[in-house]
């Protein structure tokens, strides 16, 4: 009886223990995904904050293409019936997916897009570090034994952010760094055994660059055969890529292949040997030490017969081959289109650095004493010392490259802050000139080609509806409103205005320019808070719109042709002495010879 009682009690205790283990296992089962999701949310928030601070601190502003992408979103939200993709920039579905929802926030769209582009570019370093960390094969070790993999990840992350041309692309808010990040994110997801997420990243990258189509298609075939439950996702992704690239242009432009048509005859196309030209652009993304490190990683992959490393090497080579084919077709094959394979090579170089460090450190102390006694151990010790020496030489040879990149970043940031001044002041100039509606009423807006999309975005117009050939438009005698950057601000001039509109359009003629820098004397009579900001130098230059008096001659920038070959295609400023007049002051018939008028703002109303 006692035996049966003890047997039942032991069984109940075992059952209770198994139930506890089941509950604890279940709790760990749902806690781990939550922890992973929380960590990713934290990293995403930090990267987003870094992107916003990068936008604020560096003066990053969108370029011609990026303003054109933002115009697409604003046109769909504000004037969807007039939305068209007929002109520059080339159609990219990836950017449209972001600029469309951002357009709902008005002019905050600029901040949202620039911060998103900056954050995505900075995230490329994160995914490069994670990919190199996993490629070392040391991720399953204890934390303290992973230090070679951590060094490999740091090397790859910093190396990708140091790609030549990446600072400029980040500061003008283009989509190319974003595509680099998506490709590296797909690699990281695949190495983390998340093929569905990897395919989704490849689909997004394929919406940004056509070179990714080949890799997305190959990965779709592999997922269809090897990954259970992924066929619906694969089918949707395969259909989304051509739909995004061709359906919308077919509905909003004269050609469904408008992106390829606009890329033909681009100024960056290669005119000589296409193969040599593309390879030269690819190798120019980094200096010789990094090239040798990537080549060493490829040799190491061949020696070890690592399929993953060899597959990544083949993918990088295939990307370069696709770019060569594009160059033969007449497309530009620019340097920024080769950043993706260069980033993959840097990841491989970082992983090779990690494996060399692990080989040099693994059992080095244990083999140091026997190395002095036996030849076999001595040879192994020499190999370990050689691996460590290679890493040290690589680090020393990259030190000048790091200094050059720091100087490059400083120069790019300084230039970006200068370029940001007229871009930021254009919105205020448009407001002081009466707003977009009045400006469009007075005539077609015209500016220089570099500011065409910027002006279109500020006036809520399509890029193609803004003129960019100033001289031709001025001499055409059609009603126009001419915008020209001047003295940190803008000159706005309505020209050839219809007689019935002249009274209403008189307000449009302004000189919105810098009149001074706030000083301590400026703070007199201001509220205390504003005066404190003036004294501390928080406020920037003071801008004042100056309007022209009625009847004054318009001072505009025109385009004239001269008989002398050296004076052709020069811009002339009416009301200011022209450069050709100073070189030939006695030349007869020159319209500006010996003439010097008052500045445009003298005597004007404030």
Enumerate the language-model features and the residues they cover:
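Hydrophobic/aromatic-rich transmembrane helices and adjacent perimembrane loops
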Residues: 170, 176, 182, 208, ...
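Perimembrane helix-loop-helix junctions
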Residues: 4, 16-18, 29, 200, ...
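Specific aromatic-rich, kink-prone transmembrane helix
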Residues: 127, 177-201, 344-348
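Transmembrane-helix motifs of polytopic, lipid-linked glycan transferases
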Residues: 115-143
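Catalytic lumenal/periplasmic loop and adjoining terminal transmembrane helix
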Residues: 54-60, 250, 390-523
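Hydrophobic, aromatic-rich transmembrane alpha-helices
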Residues: 220-224, 284-320
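Signature aromatic-anchored transmembrane alpha helix within multi-pass, membrane-resident enzymes
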Residues: 39-43, 146-154, 235-243, 293-294, ...
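Membrane-interface transmembrane helices that cradle and orient dolichyl/undecaprenyl
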Residues: 15, 146-147, 184-197, 223, ...
